UniProtKB/Swiss-Prot annotation:
Reactions mediated catalytically: tRNA(Ala) + L-alanine + ATP = L-alanyl-tRNA(Ala) + AMP + diphosphate
Localization: Cytoplasm
Domain notes: Consists of three domains; the N-terminal catalytic domain, the editing domain and the C-terminal C-Ala domain. The editing domain removes incorrectly charged amino acids, while the C-Ala domain, along with tRNA(Ala), serves as a bridge to cooperatively bring together the editing and aminoacylation centers thus stimulating deacylation of misacylated tRNAs.
Enzyme class, broadest EC rank: ligase
UniProt-annotated binding residues for Zn(2+): 553, 557, 655, 659
Record GO biological process: alanyl-tRNA aminoacylation; negative regulation of DNA-templated transcription
Originating species: Legionella pneumophila subsp. pneumophila (strain Philadelphia 1 / ATCC 33152 / DSM 7513)
Record function comment: Catalyzes the attachment of alanine to tRNA(Ala) in a two-step reaction: alanine is first activated by ATP to form Ala-AMP and then transferred to the acceptor end of tRNA(Ala). Also edits incorrectly charged Ser-tRNA(Ala) and Gly-tRNA(Ala) via its editing domain.
Stored InterPro entries: aa-tRNA-synth_II/BPL/LPL, Ala-tRNA-lgiase_IIc, Ala-tRNA-ligase_IIc_anticod-bd, Ala-tRNA-synth_IIc_core, Ala-tRNA-synth_IIc_N, Ala-tRNA_ligase, Ala_tRNA_ligase_euk/bac, DHHA1_dom
GO CC annotation terms, alphabetical: cytosol
Name under which the protein is recorded: Alanine--tRNA ligase
Length: 860
């Protein structure tokens, strides 16, 4: 039975038992900024378990793509060296959200394993939490599991919690017994760490809520969260002991081996590369690009580890991108997004491999040189840091290499150097946010801003400095919560509305609107009278500002579609800011847009504006929206019911913002800037409507003023500037010629001052009134005319010294280097062995230093 068949059998089994099949969520979690990657099936359902979200179904089943590399769950260093560690794996899971509980969950698991997959019951072993008598009775009395293949375990192994507080509960685990020929004892025994008993399915029963004192309280609706690794299960079904021996891995391993010559199919490096092409490809599919921070750096580490193992196998570079097609062969049917992103994945992997290959050989030589000279078994932290900082070797890659030679790194010294670098750059992790620290308000507001810009409402909450109050006086700043509001709260990149809250005897100026919990919070200042609770008010949005925001937001949708059309389908929105005056749009792409691409994008968007398509909004469930072809934005969290925004057949996206009624309302679209903001992330700044017209007029005014300054017409401006540049170039050539002539004359004048010492022609000369460029020309002239030369030229002006030194290449290694000579004379400077420059204050003992240089030459 193939891995793909096992996956489908699992999903089919649970469909037949009333479960909703939910597609694998992105590897980048949308609902938990504390989590680096999706590492379990339950991640996309976290808010359901916490009671923060409801969906149309109470039973679900998934085949979830997971990554464990970086952060708390980091398997990277073990991948390839053990039978079951992976950076990427698939987790099969079934879930109940207040529907069925322990009995059905246990029955489903046992039936699927023994009756669908036909695993002999006598090869399975079951564990429960020692205090979970209910689960124990179900297993022993109802499922008739033999007490001899059953054990009770403690809280460490069989009790699960989401954190120190919150939902938690006991779990029951099912293990597969590989037989007595494999070392290891049953779970819970002193010998449990062996490989005989392998966990294949974990069933978590969330039935308690743990408070701050550690007390457990029963949940009103207990839930079930189960997880089973597909790779482990496939190994059991296919009768192999290592996950790397299953069909999908063997296909990849053989494809890798074919890229080289006479490679042993059991080579560890093949396993490493086979694992890493899976994680790297799917991370790129989900919008992660190699970078030097966050998720992008984890991806870079994995790619570089794979490239290093390819180098170890002697695979011709670039090789890594050639494995995308074999991966599609084994996983493309289940994950068609791999097929759609094939060219994009290959391009990113090849680009990253080419970049790293340039420094890999140098870094490996440096590392091997240090290993040869090691006195003990520990590589210094300084060397490891240099490999990291200069040659791009992630620390786990260096550790991987030296572990193969029985060595280890002085991690304390390495970490100290890393800390120094962090302090200097003031870099901080973006994943340390306390997601659960945001206070939740009990108030609820109903939003009417899609259809209204003004309405009557009642004040249900007042806040000052984060505290709820009963009144806010004139001149004071504060926040107002209404029962109903037309004000849009900042979300999805669109800024919050501004406007006024007006009563008979008061006025509150709204400067910003935010969503806190279920409440819409209006921040601002009382400009008339006094606000108190329960007052009736008239809420009026600044409709001129709102209209400008609408135009910009609708334009970002047209821009997104145009980018996909012109640049490529790999483009994903990675952020936006939609304000009244302009908008910015961040997107994933690996290089700057060309002027031609920017022009094409503007033409496409403005054509859609002229088409004057109606902007249609439909509310539907999330699955129907995705099936209709609507684009779901990267990293965005959606509820079950979503708003789908369509503009003809050109753009269809999920969006909760406010928009123009027709594309023609935008009037004009203009890109004013395009630049990179991070590795693999570009930003476009744009203007629309009257702001676009104002920008165009401003540019025309600038062009007219420039033309007047240059005494030409706007139409002749390019020709005039080209002529000025040509004239400037000719002047530079003339200056260079004069400098060369001056240098030749200066060089000829001082040739007679050469002093020969032990076959080396030494010339140390102070020059008067000569700039750095002429000094370099003079040095070049002298070096071309003097063999075996050590030449030092310097100038002194206003007690500042400028020095240049040159050494003939035939005596490099024999004579002091040019950089050494410069530093000896003036203390500062650097360069190559044959040419160096420096400068600084004039040393008091200048003559002594010149004498010391002569003595250095005499000692050769």
């Amino acid at each position: 039975m193939k891995s793909s068949e096992i996956r489908q059998a699992f999903l089919n089994y649970f469909v037949q038992r009333g479960h909703q099949i939910v597609a694998s969520s992105s590897l980048v979690p949308s609902n938990d900024p504390t989590l680096l990657f999706t590492n379990a099936g339950m991640v996309q359902f976290k808010d359901l378990f916490l009671g923060l979200e409801t969906r149309s179904y109470q039973r679900a089943a998934t085949a979830q793509r997971c990554v464990r590399a970086g952060g708390k769950h980091n398997d990277l260093e073990n991948v390839g060296y053990t039978a079951r560690h992976h950076t990427f794996f698939e987790m099969l899971g079934n879930f109940s959200f207040g529907d069925y509980f322990k009995r059905e969950a246990i029955q489903y698991a046992w039936e699927f394993l023994t009756e669908v997959l036909h695993i002999p019951a006598e090869r399975l072993w079951v564990t429960v939490y020692k205090e979970d008598l209910e689960a124990e009775d179900i297993w022993l009395k109802e499922m008739k599991v033999s007490p001899e293949r059953f054990s009770r375990c403690g809280e460490k192994d069989n009790f699960w919690s989401m954190g120190d507080t919150g939902p938690c509960g006991p779990c029951t685990e099912i293990f597969y017994d590989h037989g007595p020929e494999v070392a290891g004892g049953p779970p819970g025994s002193p010998d449990e760490d062996g490989d005989r008993y392998i966990e294949i399915w974990n069933l978590v029963f969330m039935q308690f809520n743990r408070d701050r004192e550690g007390h457990l309280h029963p949940l009103p609706k207990p839930s079930v969260d189960t997880g089973m690794g597909l790779e482990r299960l496939a190994a059991v079904i296919q009768g192999v002991h290592s996950n790397y021996e299953i069909d999908s891995f063997q296909y990849l391993i053989k494809a890798i081996a074919q890229l080289g010559q006479d490679i042993d199919l059991n080579h560890t490096s093949l396993k490493v590369i086979a694992d890493h092409i899976r994680s790297c490809s799917f991370l790129i599919v989900d919008g992660v690009l190699p970078s030097n921070e966050g998720r992008g750096y984890v991806l870079r580490r994995i790619i570089r580890r794979a490239v290093r193992h390819g180098n170890k196998l002697g695979l011709p570079s670039p090789f890594f991108s050639k494995l995308v097609q074999p991966l599609i062969d084994v996983m493309g049917d289940a994950y068609p997004e791999l097929i759609n992103s094939k060219a994009h994945i290959e391009r990113i992997l090849q680009q990253e491999e080419n970049q790293f290959t340039r420094t890999l050989e140098q870094g490996l030589r440096l590392l091997q040189d240090h290993i040869k000279n090691l006195q003990g078994q520990e590589l210094s932290g300084e060397v490891a840091f240099k490999l990291y900082d200069t040659y791009g070797f992630p620390i786990d890659l260096t550790a991987d290499i030296i572990r193969e030679q029985g060595l280890h790194i002085d991690m304390e010294a390495f970490n100290q150097l890393m800390q120094q670098q962090r302090e200097q750059s003031q870099a901080a992790s973006q994943f340390t946010t306390d997601y659960h620290a945001v206070s939740q308000l009990d108030h609820q507001s109903e939003f009417h801003g899609y259809e209204k810009e003004s309405m009557e409402a009642k004040i249900i909450g007042l806040l000052q400095e984060g505290n709820e109050v009963k009144s806010i006086n004139k001149g004071a700043k504060g926040a107002v919560i209404l029962d109903h509001t037309p004000f849009y709260a900042e979300s999805g990149g669109q800024v919050g509305d501004k406007g006024l809250l007006i009563g008979k005897e008061f006025t509150f100026q709204v400067d910003d609107t935010q969503k806190v919990g279920q409440a819409v919070v209006h921040y601002g200042k009382v400009i008339k009278g006094e606000l108190t609770l329960d007052l009736l008010i008239h809420a009026q949005v600044d409709n001129i500002r709102r209209d400008a925001i609408r135009l910009n937001h609708t334009a970002t949708h047209l821009l997104h579609a145009a980018l996909k059309k012109i640049v490529g389908q790999h483009v994903q929105q990675r952020g936006s800011l939609v304000d009244a005056e302009r908008a910015r749009f961040d997107f994933s792409h690996f290089e700057a847009l060309t002027p031609q691409q920017i022009q094409q994008i503007e033409e496409v968007v403005n054509a859609q504006i002229r088409a004057n398509n109606e902007v249609i909004t439909q509310v539907m469930d999330i699955e129907s929206a995705k099936q209709s072809g609507a684009v779901a934005l990267f990293g965005e969290k959606y509820s079950d019911a979503v708003r789908v925004l369509s503009m003809g057949d050109f753009s269809k996206e999920l969006c909760g913002g406010t928009h123009a009624r027709r594309t023609g309302d935008i009037g004009l679209f203009k890109i004013v800037a395009e630049y990179g903001i991070a590795s693999g992330i570009r930003r476009i700044e744009m203007v629309t409507g009257r702001y676009a017209l104002a920008w165009v007029n401003e540019q025309l005014g600038f062009m007219n003023n420039l033309a007047a300054t240059l005494k030409t017409t706007p139409n002749s401006l390019q020709e005039k500037v080209s002529q000025l540049l040509l004239d400037n170039k000719n002047q530079e050539k003339m200056i260079a010629k004069l400098l060369s002539e001056k240098a030749q004359k200066s060089g000829a004048d001082i040739l007679g001052e050469i002093e020969e010492i032990k076959g080396i022609n030494l010339l140390i000369k102070q020059l008067e009134g000569m700039d750095s460029q002429t000094m370099r020309h003079t040095m070049d002239q002298l070096k071309s005319r003097i063999d075996s030369a050590v030449i030092i030229l310097f100038t002194i002006e206003q007690n500042k010294m400028n020095v240049i030194a040159g050494v003939s290449k035939n005596i490099i290694g024999k004579a002091p280097s040019a950089a050494q000579l410069v530093r000896h004379l003036c203390g500062k400077g650097g360069g190559r062995d044959d040419m160096a420059q420096g400068g600084g204050g004039v040393p008091e003992d200048l003559n002594s230093k010149i004498k010391e240089i002569k003595e250095m030459i005499e000692k050769i």
